[in-house]
């Protein structure tokens, strides 16, 4: 990769493990950012329903930011990575019936875009239209597909990210241009640890996706008993209404720009991620390294991280430390787990 271009972990100074003495600051109620107060209300209600570490878990932040990113020029493509039964699906269920939210449980190579004359272009052009949020609660099934099917699905996701394209056949060539889709799609995909096998191969998913490693809170037997016998359970309809209100209000608060220091931090992080995700070829027998490919260019990563940070600021405001903490967690999550452990 070139010694002069390598970014060290010390240069980036990422606090990937989290500092227990550096919790998100508590502001006085009179000074609190309005959307932040609404966010806390939603999170507190979820904590009555699920086991949540409200100080160190940023799943609600990340999902909310991805939803409001559809208002950006380039919406977010986010992978929520976590073990089965870690709460990912429960969070995503809270978005059901939200405007422009579309959930798919099964993907084939011809689901999102299709050249069939009766398909109206596929699910994205025909159902989602020009703008929407695509949610796949179990993207692991896609990773389990055969390589040819998987690559075709990845190709269609790249079209969705780029905001223009479609699928054509050799029969109806006269209508190819008319079938081309243009729009903006934000994506929220839930996936297990299997995604780690693909992070090391940037050519498969490219630098379009961001990742968030969601670690379920570990509790002991007494805590589990106390939680399971709680009388207080949130009203899901009320909770969904507040989430919808939070998203609407946050969309209106999206900042146009971010401070220069934060822009430099994000670009440095994007370059660091790109270097850590560089593809390495090894000998099949000896496992010796044969070739380290040039890292991907960080421009799309930089754009995605910048968009994420803007959305987090729209939720929490500039005075809160929570946007930077959530951003840092995503930066660490974008690096393959094994390589992350090595640099730690």
Please provide the spans of the model-predicted regions.
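Replication-associated primase and helicase/ATPase modules
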Residues: 1-44, 102, 128
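Basic, alpha-helical nucleic-acid-binding regions used in initiation and control of genome expression
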Residues: 14, 80, 329
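Conserved phosphate/pyrophosphate-binding and hydrolysis machinery centered on Walker-type P-loop NTPases
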Residues: 32-36, 49-57, 81, 147-150, ...
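Pre-Walker A (pre-P-loop) alpha-helix and adjacent loop at the N terminus of AAA/AAA+ ATPase modules
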Residues: 36-76
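Contiguous, well-ordered alpha-helical segments that form the cores/surfaces of helical PPI scaffolds
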Residues: 56-69, 159, 302-311
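Conserved ASCE/P-loop NTPase catalytic core
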Residues: 65-221
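C-terminal engagement/docking regions of AAA+ P-loop ATPases
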Residues: 84, 93, 291, 315-344
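Phosphate-sensing "switch" segment of ASCE/P-loop ATPases
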Residues: 176-184, 192-328
């Amino acid at each position: 990769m070139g010694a002069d271009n390598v970014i060290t972990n010390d240069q980036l100074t990422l606090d990937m493990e989290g500092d227990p003495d550096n919790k998100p600051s508590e502001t006085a109620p009179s000074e609190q950012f309005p959307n932040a107060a609404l966010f806390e209300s939603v999170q507190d209600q979820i904590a009555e329903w699920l086991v949540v570490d409200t100080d160190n878990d940023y799943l609600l932040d990340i999902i909310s930011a991805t939803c409001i990113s559809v208002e950006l020029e380039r919406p977010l493509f986010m992978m929520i990575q976590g073990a089965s039964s870690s709460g990912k699906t429960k969070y995503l269920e809270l978005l059901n019936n939200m405007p422009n939210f579309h959930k798919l449980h099964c993907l084939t190579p011809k689901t999102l875009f299709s050249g069939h004359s009766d398909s109206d272009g596929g699910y994205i052009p025909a159902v989602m239209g020009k703008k929407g949020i695509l949610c796949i609660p179990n993207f692991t099934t896609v990773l389990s597909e055969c390589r040819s099917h998987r690559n075709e699905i990845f190709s269609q996701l790249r079209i969705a990210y780029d905001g223009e394209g479609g699928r054509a056949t050799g029969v109806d060539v006269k209508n190819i241009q008319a079938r081309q889709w243009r729009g903006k799609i934000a994506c929220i995909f839930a996936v297990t640890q299997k995604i780690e096998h693909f992070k090391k191969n940037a050519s498969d998913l490219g630098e379009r996706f961001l990742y968030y490693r969601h670690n379920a809170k570990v509790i002991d037997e007494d805590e589990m008993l106390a939680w399971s016998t709680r009388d207080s359970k949130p009203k899901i309809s009320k909770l969904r209404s507040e989430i919808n209100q939070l998203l609407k209000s946050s969309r209106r608060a999206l900042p146009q720009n971010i401070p220069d220091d934060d822009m430099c931090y994000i670009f440095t992080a994007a370059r660091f991620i790109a270097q850590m995700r560089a593809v390495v070829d090894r000998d099949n027998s000896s496992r010796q390294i044969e070739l380290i490919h040039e890292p991907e260019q960080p421009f799309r990563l930089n754009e995605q991280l910048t968009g994420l940070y803007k959305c987090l600021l729209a939720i929490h405001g500039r005075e809160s430390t929570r946007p930077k903490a959530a951003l840092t967690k995503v930066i660490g999550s974008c690096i393959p787990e094994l390589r992350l452990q090595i640099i730690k």
